[in-house]
């Protein structure tokens, strides 16, 4: 599941990092990247390499959110479903990682409970963007539901998560979910804890949210 700068400026930034106290063993970090890198394009780690990293860290990529937190913290954002060598190396410098053991030691800190609301909002958006396929700007509904169940567990009330996933799964008119719908659901959960206060005429929520509220109202009447 899943401003411009010159090359000399990039080298300068890397050089300044290596001169900092507590600098990492850059050759060791590069060796980790090389082991995980794609065979056809050794400048990136793609899903197969990420799966290999999960094996080394004893993480289940299908259910353990910590792999997504790790990729977010490393700085994967250039393209979906991959991390470039520059992103990986910059992330290793920032997180002081130059061995698989250090990656393992970082795992306890990757719990989303350690993220404040703004950090989680950034991470939540990353989860959508990282799991896009190719040039698609939307995600398949089934993938979105699985992501919601993994990413929002323990972040929003269980009932809201369960009913929204149930609603989304049953709506035949929605086969794919947009980034706006994805991000709006999290905002909606924070801003409208009680559905009785929801006012469709005063809101600017996507239609998906309006229809969810109607769905819940009908459900409560039964």
Residue ranges and their predicted role:
Residues 34, 89, 162-168, 183-186, ...:
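Compositionally biased, low-structure terminal segments
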Residues 1-34:
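Plant-biased recognition of short, low-complexity, intrinsically disordered N-terminal tails
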Residues 205-222:
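C-terminal helix/juxtamembrane-tail motif
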Residues 39-50, 65, 76-93, 133-144, ...:
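Acidic Ca2+-chelating loop motifs
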Residues 2, 10, 51, 99-100:
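Predominantly extracellular/lumenal beta-strand repeat domains
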Residues 126-131:
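Amphipathic alpha-helical assembly/oligomerization segments
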Residues 22-31, 53-83, 94-120, 124, ...:
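EF-hand-based Ca2+ sensing modules
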């Amino acid at each position: 599941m899943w401003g411009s700068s010159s090359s000399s400026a990039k080298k300068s930034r890397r050089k300044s990092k290596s001169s900092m106290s507590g600098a990492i063993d850059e050759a060791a970090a590069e060796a980790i990247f090389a082991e995980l890198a794609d065979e056809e394009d050794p400048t990136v780690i793609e899903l197969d390499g990420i799966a290999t990293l999960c094996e080394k860290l004893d993480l289940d990529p299908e259910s353990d959110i910590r792999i997504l937190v790790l990729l977010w913290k490393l700085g994967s954002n250039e393209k979906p479903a991959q991390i470039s060598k520059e992103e990986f190396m910059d992330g290793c410098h920032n997180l002081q990682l130059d061995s698989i053991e250090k990656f393992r030691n970082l795992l306890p800190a990757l719990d989303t409970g350690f993220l404040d609301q703004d950090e989680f909002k950034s991470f939540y958006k990353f989860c959508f963007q990282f799991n896009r396929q190719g040039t698609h700007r939307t995600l398949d509904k089934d993938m979105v539901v699985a992501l919601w169940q993994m990413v929002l567990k323990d972040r929003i009330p269980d009932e809201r998560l369960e009913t929204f996933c149930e609603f989304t799964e049953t709506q035949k008119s929605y086969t794919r979910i947009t980034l706006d719908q994805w991000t709006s659901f999290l905002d909606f959960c924070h801003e409208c804890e009680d559905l009785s206060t929801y006012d469709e005429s005063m809101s600017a929520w996507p239609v998906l949210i309006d229809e969810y509220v109607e769905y819940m109202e009908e459900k409560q009447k039964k």
